């Protein structure tokens, strides 16, 4: 009998202890202000900390943003957590209001614009080159490619590295009878938009069969996530070819081709040739394509990248201070931040593009009142 009573007491005590532990855990979780979990209140605001901004989008510009946001944090104490998930992902997160800003190498389409729920501003950050990188064992030469040959490779019409179309352009290179392994993006990508926009301009066949966009139905090849993923596919695949941003190619010590431009010149992607392509008349909303440039020394597969933010910043319980921190960050990016572009193989904005970016940022409001005042934030 005593044993039975002891068992009952033990079981009861154990159950009470477990219940108390569960209550303590639930209390701790509900009171936890860390980033590990979200409550229903969190869903209406990206963060309660106005000194910590959230961004997401383009992998194309990630090497530059990493530098800019580190420097800006050191200067101002404002932290920026940027998720390099691709332009499509950045647009979606901005639409869902889970980030303060997105970034895309493709301007919003008319359909995307309608779905955003309110006006979105496009602020140009810089321009960059999409390079055609390759991995042919034993070959260290810089290859030359024409627009039609590049299109045929991605259409699956040219499948061997020693195809006559490639050999005729590179007569001094001993190209092997190796299969071409095409790599492309698997995620929604502004880099893809730049590349397919170019192919659509130079190849009627590509335009009619595939077209342009941040995501397309690829006729051939394997997909990788982000510029990092495509670079990885090229490096690990003998015979590989793919399109990546210039900074990724240089940082990974990868070969990339000279591309023939509209003027008939074979152009190496550099800061100078990207800047030449970007020397265009920019409209007031900054949405412009740089591909297939008319500039004789311009690299033909170049493009801008844009920070995206809602014009009216009073939404989802955002504070005025948070809105000011975001606009101040982007203002710094288009001014002092431009000094870091060339060192990371991006082309800084021209004076004209900077002036347009300034006007766009000056149109941002909080409860209808401009966030930037005359002469403000010009340092």
Please place each PLM-identified region on the residue numbering:
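Bacterial N-terminal signal peptides that target proteins for export
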Residues: 2-16
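C-terminal motif of bacterial Sec signal peptides marking the signal peptidase cleavage site
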Residues: 24-28
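Flexible loop/hinge segments at secondary-structure junctions
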Residues: 29-379
